[in-house]
Amino acid sequence: MKSTEQHYSIKEAMLFSQRIAQLSKALWKSIEKDWQQWIKPFNLNINEHHILWIAYHFKGASISEIAKFGVMHVSTAFNFSKKLEEKGLLSFSKKQDDKRNTYIELTEKGEEVLMKLMETYDPTRNAVFNGALPLRELYGKFPEILEMMCIVRNIYGDDFMEIFERAFENIKEDFVEQDGKLVKRAPKAEEHEKELASPG
């Protein structure tokens, strides 16, 4: 049986929740501005970019998965996915064994746009990155934000955090840095052919 006894004061609870709220709002304002500037040349808004991002990492996702992992309402996920379909960046489908859910997948054009976006990422134009840079210089690494991740896990659950982590693992595996840009890694067969073709 769960104990209902409080081990914190109301003042402590209010101070913590308001501190998180104010810091999150300040961070979001900066994040939103930088995100919009990054994707603006591609005629996308933040929800559309987020949907493309999730569809890429899922290799096909249901609208409800997009809503859950994009932290948006189902109708928002559907409406922005429809706009992406009209732009030729997504395709809609139903699965033979699941006629109730609508699934989306990146089209070739959608993946091209996402890859170009990755290539145009410029950390010098990102305020949060620049704000964290002195910490990296001091400690040799960026903040891991473990406490924040724990809070998010407790709110949204393990599934959410697994997808969150998978997305970043995919970036580590799928992309390499070339000439100061992130580019998609060549498939293994192509890499092997290049190794065979290179004189050595």
Swiss-Prot record:
Disulfide bonds: none
Keyword Membrane (UniProt): no
Name of the protein in question: HTH-type transcriptional regulator Hpr
Keyword annotations of the record: DNA-binding, Repressor, Sporulation, Transcription, Transcription regulation
Protein's organism: Geobacillus thermodenitrificans (strain NG80-2)
Gene designation per UniProt: hpr
Positions of transmembrane segments: none
Gene3D superfamilies xref list: Winged helix-like DNA-binding domain superfamily/Winged helix DNA-binding domain (1.10.10.10)
Known partners and oligomeric status: Homodimer.
